[in-house]
Amino acid sequence: MKAEFKAKFGAKSAAMRGTLGALAAALTGMAALTGAVVLGPNGSAGASEGSRLDPDLPAPAVEMSISRQPEDPGKAVNLTLDDGPDPTWTPKALEILAASGAKATFCMTGPNAQAHPDLVKKVVAAGHRLCNHSVSHDTAMDRKSVAYQGKEILDAKRMIDEASGGAELRYYRAPGGAFTPQSRQLAAAHGMRSLGWNVDPGDYRRPGADTILATVERQLANGPTILLHDGGGDRSQTMQALQNLLPRLKEQGYAFSFPQA
């Protein structure tokens, strides 16, 4: 009986290993076609962050790994605002930031920057930094071809550069954190370090200003880079939360920094 069980179990185990091996090979092949990587909840690419360079792409000019740590030593946060610029909410964000002496990184889509070059210039003039957030905000970019990813990144860079008058564009944030090794290499080759996040209160879902604030404070233990939005819809709740958040952060001894570039 024991020998029979062992024979049956061994056969099933071998078959299962074969099935899992085939599945892993298929997934690896699929990833190779698109450069896709499995991401964590904070825009992290896990082990793939140390992936090899693609010889068919230009060499990186800056660090390829995804940035989340602040430039400033000590207790600091990185405020980031996505999906703008927006003619209603970006000026409000600038006003709130100025009132607290805070700095932020604005992750702009190319078309929005192109439509509102005056706002792009105001962001730069106020001492904030710019980040490339692609052209079409395609959160499935990591499942598209490398050529598609490159066009999204470089077309957005051109639009933002033109809108800003050539201000430094230090970062690239993939929509939804849909980074690939190739997109990170392409961005780095053009001077943009990939930018992740640690804190995501889901403000784009409009859960209420108090909920946004409470979630940010709870998630700060995850790390210093806070993801908020100044574009893509009604951001009144985000602005209210930001207005309440900044004085609290200062009271708790946080400095306002920029992500390492």
Where are these regions (language model features)?
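Active-site beta->alpha N-cap acidic-glycine motif
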Residues: 50-144, 152-159, 169
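Short histidine/acidic/glycine/proline-rich micro-motifs that form metal-
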Residues: 110-113, 136-140, 175-178, 200-203, ...
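Short beta-strands and strand-loop turn motifs
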Residues: 132-134, 195-198, 225-230
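His/Asp/Glu-enriched short active-site or ligand-binding loop at hydrolase and phosphoryl-transfer sites
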Residues: 178-219, 253-261
